[in-house]
Curated annotation (Swiss-Prot):
Phylogenetic placement of the source organism: Bacteria, Pseudomonadati, Pseudomonadota, Gammaproteobacteria, Enterobacterales
Xref: PANTHER family: K(+)_H(+) ANTIPORTER SUBUNIT KHTT, TRANSPORT PROTEIN YIDE-RELATED
Matches recorded under Pfam families: Asp-Al_Ex, TrkA_C
Keyword tags: Cell membrane, Membrane, Repeat, Transmembrane, Transmembrane helix, Transport
Protein name: Putative transport protein YidE
Natural source organism: Salmonella choleraesuis (strain SC-B67)
Transmembrane annotation, as ranges: 4-24, 28-48, 65-85, 95-115, 158-178, 371-391, 393-413, 437-457, 464-484, 493-513, 533-553
Amino acid sequence: MSDIALTVSVLALVAVVDLWIGNIKVRGVGFGIGGVLFGGIIVGHFVDQAGVTLSGDMLHFIQEFGLILFVYTIGIQVGPGFFASLRVSGLRLNLFAVLIVIMGGLVTAILHKIFAIPLPVVLGIFSGAVTNTPALGAGQQILRDLGTPVDLVDQMGMSYAMAYPFGICGILLTMWLMRLIFRVNVEAEAQKHESSLANGHSLIQTMNIRVENPNLNNMAIQDVPILNSDKIICSRLKRDDTLMVPSPGTIIQAGDLLHLVGQSTDLHNAQLVIGKEVDTSLSTRGTDLRVERVVVTNEKVLGKRIRDLHFKERYDVVISRLNRAGVELVASSDASLQFGDILNLVGRPASIDAVANVVGNAQQKLQQVQMLPVFIGIGLGVLLGSIPLFVPGFPVALKLGLAGGPLIMALILGRIGSIGKLYWFMPPSANLALRELGIVLFLAVVGLKSGGDFVDTLTQGEGLSWIGYGIFITAIPLITVGLLARIFAKMNYLTLCGMLAGSMTDPPALAFANNLHATSGAAALSYATVYPLVMFLRIITPQLLAVIFWGMG
């Protein structure tokens, strides 16, 4: 059997063992994709014992390509919501998550100096303790750039594997500890979270208002400042028994009922100007109007602003809401359409059908993957990661590398959405498949390379001390920030659990947090809010630590 065939066969065996281990769960919690690493270590140990030689160049390529696939698909997935997560609504959560990252780096630096832990080993412990695989890849790459021998770079995978198990368990124990210390009632926390959403500024709501302000009588909607803004959409107007779709030029009269869509504060401000909120239904039922959701799939409208499509003027149809990547937005006239956007349309059936034809509304296209943008994005990401950033006093130039470059490029492209006929939307199933394939390939190779010396290191070497160092790196930041967030910021417990899981970019921890309450989305929301920024910082941190420690000797 050729080296290539043998290498592929061993990798396939590793993947089978890995995924089997990952599916083993105790009380609903398992290693998940982290099981791939341990399967690779097991197979790698026996491969080494048998004296089997695998293709080193092929293993290196598979490892790097797997990492690229993984981080790129993550960036495409979270890109549409990344920049939104940095706004004020998520600022507090991101600050706490960043504090966890910084504290983890400081603890790592202190342990390195006090115990003289070799640089590859301490970076591996750090990556495993925070359960972040791209950090492992970024650390290995910067070490190679610094001229570290290959056998020492491979030690990083071993120390990563030593610290990884408690990295998973540590965050679960922290959640349990917070619940015990503060005697948390999970059901009450879920209700508080729902109440805060209802009273907050993040949800799109509706309000029916009767026009009672005499100053607005016989004025066009576009001449009323509160209605001619990007914060409020007037999607229906009822006059006497007639329900209509208003246009900017529609004249409003005293007694008209307006159906407004926007955030609660903006709706309240509109009510103060216009008149009185009423309970009268403005439902399209029993009228010649209807409400329908359509999806944007036509390349010809991608990147175009809603105002430039003239749906109201041409078809007498209003877009009342826009859903992008699961987030409900006010369909402002300046909003640009992206592939996969879901539009809430109000109008007559024939008119809605006409608008649906314009925007596409081809459900089958949502399941298709444009491969050209995928490889363009990966290529640009690799180029971005290769750009050197020279910092005075540092022995080598900093780079985003193969972990950071594709991630940042994917975040940017995911946010842009489309350029001409190219769009970077990827169906969730396809994204998940590529992401899982990438991480399986990467961790399988890391495990294979580490497996030969893993058992000896654990039983006869410093494996136990590495585990101890990892416990400190995991526990100290999580417990400290958890206490600060709960005591001083009065953070909701479920939100806190999601933030802790997101700060470690740990899906098993998110699964545990979600299971704390069956119906609350608090944990998932906070996890998604901090995940993009934390993932970027987790990739950069080992590179900074490596360069700083290398320069200090």
